[in-house]
Amino acid sequence: MKITVPATSANIGPGFDSVGVAVSKYLTIEVLEPADVWFIEHDLGDIPSDENNLLISTALQVKSDLQPHKLVMTSDIPLARGLGSSSSVIVAGIELANQLADLKLSDDDKLDIATKIEGHPDNVAPAIFGNLVVASYVDEHVNSIVTEFPECAFVAFIPSYELKTSESRGALPSDLSYKDAVAASSIANVAIAALFAGDLVKAGRAIQGDMFHERYRQKLVKEFATIKELSGQYGAYATYLSGAGPTVMTLTPNDQAEALKTAIDGLGLDGETLILSVDKGGVVVD
């Protein structure tokens, strides 16, 4: 059995802690034979290979008496870069328990569990459903809507350094004035409505008008302003911080993606530029 979970790009500007899209980088878990103890074969560096791994600890939160197995974990989702690496593992852990214990969890069940573990739905929801997901988590209740993302390319600049979510959250203010909250909410409303309507020009304008988090976090990602300015010269719809950063994501017409990638590479920044697409499948079991 093989479990595959996509990477995710959350927030998308003003959709803070609420909006995310699944993209074409993947975590794969291959389930091998039963064993006396859990063992995960991987080449992902200094992460546990036993039940202390987030994958297994998540699965055991769902079903505490699972039969241990040998597993193989592979992933091309970079760690601590704002592409949902931990969320993909949480979703995979829930699916692992679902399959091994035949729990018959619905996607909504999985989202409820994942959100309680993660604390917000913006990454775990698209990892489960695929596509674009808008979700809320209030009073321990998750409400979500899934739709297709308008046709475009995602040009991701992934810096060589990590940025922990806790550090990125530390840059945020403790509150907003009522006036700013109303303005920020109206911008988010337009961004979501435009994405649902397929109008990437208006969506892009609203995405770049975010008032919730990007203005505070940009100083932690020194490449952001340079890439945003350059992307505008190539007709991009919007540039935003993916999740908590440091990945800088640009939405661009498909026919401009390669040219923009080449231009970003030409800046000589310390990192990698990739062209990604929307993943429409979410978590998949083969």
From Swiss-Prot:
Q: Which SUPFAM superfamilies match?
A: GHMP Kinase, C-terminal domain (SSF55060), Ribosomal protein S5 domain 2-like (SSF54211)
| EC number(s) given by UniProt | 2.7.1.39
| GO MF annotations in UniProt | ATP binding; homoserine kinase activity
Q: Where in the cell is it found?
A: Cytoplasm
Keyword Kinase appears in the UniProt entry: yes
NCBIfam families according to UniProt: thrB
Q: What does this protein do?
A: Catalyzes the ATP-dependent phosphorylation of L-homoserine to L-homoserine phosphate.
Q: What name has this protein been given in UniProt?
A: Homoserine kinase
Q: What gene codes for this chain? A: thrB
